């Protein structure tokens, strides 16, 4: 029924070239992992809509979501269409071969749809050990060893069952049209193809992403994906079971096991038994707002709740932004100092206590206890504490420290529909291009490397985030929905890619909107900053020199880097809804 208007809309978007108008201790190694390469700064002022808004990482994906809402669909319908298009046009970041965390507000409650990948039943705590030692990180990433059972397709189906309005099959039409007729390779995808040293080693990926002479396909060239179109047609007509059983599942398992040097243990049983989970949202209060996010296996909301619990007693509003390098606002040295010290303490606790709560006892209430956070916050002094130690929250078990790297190839979607339903969804295949295994036109994840490579820490204590069969690896994905604490009215949908730096990207944005009176786009535009219990990380080229020097004077070990977040969000304002997208990437928003 919807094929003609949706196909026409996508074709028009393609013809228009996708142009959119915008209205001193040694740190843990994981803190030094840089986000995906930058796309260059593209100035964005935000997009205004009265009735609804869609924000995502690629204009074609945004257009797909926009058309779904125009056709009478819900925010969840739109999010599904957006994610399917992202599988095609932003394959390095997310897709049906990966996992997702989706928050949904239906006007009554916040539900958390957990599509995080799971470890195979044959996985053991020795999965990433070699000769008694943890293997080199990328030796674990590249190949079948790192592939977990993908969860996104099941999660999308569960969300649609509960919140969808349009027929399931219609949600696939924009992605199928683009896969069959072709899409234009974006500058970001082209740049990442040029820089990746592993992807071309996979024959299927090489044939798709590279030319006959081995050079990557250039930005602006058109690419079709008939293999993915066929998969999407199958899922549209047969439903999610077709992904987890039968030929499509068998192809995934065969690909994982066939890697010549690093085969994996994913089985047909692992895929057939995968289930998405419906959880309750996890919320905390800050200033006049109630901030709701994802519970375990995400660590993001717990960490943010701790950070802002420690900052609640500080007069952050008085620490107004200063003038940045390009004359735009930037956080002051004192604001960065207080935030980064709180983040060190939160990350220390995160690394010790947070993992899949279906497998380990996570002391959530203790970690967010106001008295505990007051004691932790009292550790913040005038000078940087350097490397923070984990605390002992109420009901905390004895756990070992985990320094698992978490790589930043992820995407975020924020949508509010005409009825006020809101979605905040972060999805990922983990590293850029995931495991570098391509099957049937899409890439498989490497999410198992989000587990700790070791099961015991140096003191012999068990690591909460160790590999166990069927377990979901800890994530930092932090999709948020923010509400007015008094009225209960939705204020914002917000999130970002960026690996474990997601927590600080989202935290910076909350400071901007909740303490400094910035609108969502202005807060996203602020130079990024934070700490992951290593150095204090600042955005190169945009952080004022005076701020850098002031932080060094306070004892901070400062690292300047690109800090390429990919924040997307929607914020209520006087005119309806403000859509916001990160100038550091290619995202846009569109509403009406």
Residue ranges and their predicted role:
Residues 15-17:
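C-terminal motif of bacterial Sec signal peptides marking the signal peptidase cleavage site
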Residues 19-21:
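Bacterial signal peptide processing site
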Residues 1-8:
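Bacterial N-terminal signal peptides that target proteins for export
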Residues 88-95, 101-105, 109-112, 262-267, ...:
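Active-site rim segments in enzyme catalytic domains, especially the processed small/beta chain
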Residues 470-472, 506, 515-562:
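Extended C-terminal subregions enriched in glycine
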Residues 32, 316-428, 437, 582:
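Internal maturation/activation junctions in enzymes
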Residues 278, 407-410, 475-477:
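Short, small/polar residue-rich loop motifs at catalytic or cofactor-binding pockets
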Residues 23-63, 67, 75-245, 250-295, ...:
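Noncatalytic scaffold domains of N-terminal-nucleophile
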């Amino acid at each position: 029924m919807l094929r003609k208007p949706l196909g026409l809309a996508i074709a028009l978007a393609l013809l228009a070239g996708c142009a959119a108008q915008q209205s001193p201790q040694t740190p843990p190694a994981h803190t030094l992992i840089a986000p995906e390469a930058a796309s260059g700064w593209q100035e964005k002022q935000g997009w205004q809509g009265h009735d609804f808004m869609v924000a995502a990482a690629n204009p074609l994906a945004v257009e797909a979501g926009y058309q779904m809402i125009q056709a009478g669909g819900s925010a969840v319908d739109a999010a599904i269409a957006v994610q399917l298009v992202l599988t095609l046009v932003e394959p390095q970041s997310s897709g049906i071969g990966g996992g997702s965390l989706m928050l949904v507000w239906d006007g009554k409650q916040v539900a958390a749809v957990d599509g995080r990948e799971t470890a195979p039943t044959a996985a053991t705590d020795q999965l990433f050990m070699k000769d008694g030692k943890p293997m080199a990180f990328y030796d674990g990433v590249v190949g079948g060893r790192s592939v977990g059972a993908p969860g996104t397709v099941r999660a999308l189906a569960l969300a649609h069952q509960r919140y969808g309005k349009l027929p399931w099959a219609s949600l696939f039409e924009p992605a199928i049209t683009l896969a069959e007729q072709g899409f234009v390779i974006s500058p970001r995808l082209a740049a990442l193809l040029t820089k990746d040293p592993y992807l071309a080693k996979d024959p299927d990926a090489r044939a798709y992403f590279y030319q006959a002479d081995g050079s990557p396909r250039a930005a602006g060239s058109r690419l079709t994906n008939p293999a993915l179109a066929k998969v999407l047609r199958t899922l549209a007509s047969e439903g999610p079971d077709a992904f987890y059983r039968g030929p499509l599942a068998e192809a995934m398992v065969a690909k994982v096991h066939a890697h010549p040097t690093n085969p994996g243990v994913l089985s047909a049983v692992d895929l057939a038994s995968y289930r998405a989970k419906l959880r309750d949202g996890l919320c905390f209060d800050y200033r006049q707002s109630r901030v709701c996010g994802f519970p375990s296996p995400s660590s993001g909301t717990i960490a943010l709740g701790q950070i802002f619990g420690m900052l609640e007693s500080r007069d952050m509003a008085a620490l107004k932004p200063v003038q940045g390098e390009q004359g735009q606002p930037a956080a002051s040295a004192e604001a960065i100092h207080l935030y980064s010290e709180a983040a060190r303490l939160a990350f220390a606790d995160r690394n010790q206590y947070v993992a899949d709560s279906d497998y380990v006892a996570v002391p959530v209430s203790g970690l967010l206890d106001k008295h505990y956070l007051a004691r932790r916050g009292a550790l913040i002094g005038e000078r940087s504490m350097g490397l923070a130690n984990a605390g002992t929250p109420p009901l905390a078990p004895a756990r070992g420290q985990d320094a698992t790297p978490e790589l930043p190839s992820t995407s975020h979607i924020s949508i509010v529909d005409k009825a006020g339903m809101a979605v905040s969804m972060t999805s990922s295949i983990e590293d850029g291009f995931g495991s570098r295994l391509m099957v049937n036109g899409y890439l498989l994840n490497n999410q198992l490397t989000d587990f700790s490579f070791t099961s015991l820490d140096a003191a012999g204590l068990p690591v909460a985030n160790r590999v166990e069969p069927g377990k979901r690896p800890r994530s930092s994905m932090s999709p948020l929905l923010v509400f007015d604490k008094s009225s209960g009215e939705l204020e914002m949908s917000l999130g970002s890619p960026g690996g474990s730096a997601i927590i600080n990207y989202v935290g910076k944005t909350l400071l901007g909107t909740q303490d400094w009176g910035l609108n969502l786009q202005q807060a996203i535009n602020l130079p990024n900053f934070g700490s992951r219990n290593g150095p204090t990380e600042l955005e190169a080229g945009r952080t004022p020199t005076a701020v850098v020097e002031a932080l060094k004077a306070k004892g901070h070990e400062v690292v300047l880097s690109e800090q390429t977040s990919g924040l997307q969000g929607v914020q209520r304002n006087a005119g309806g809804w403000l859509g916001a997208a990160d100038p550091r990437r290619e995202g846009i928003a569109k509403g009406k």
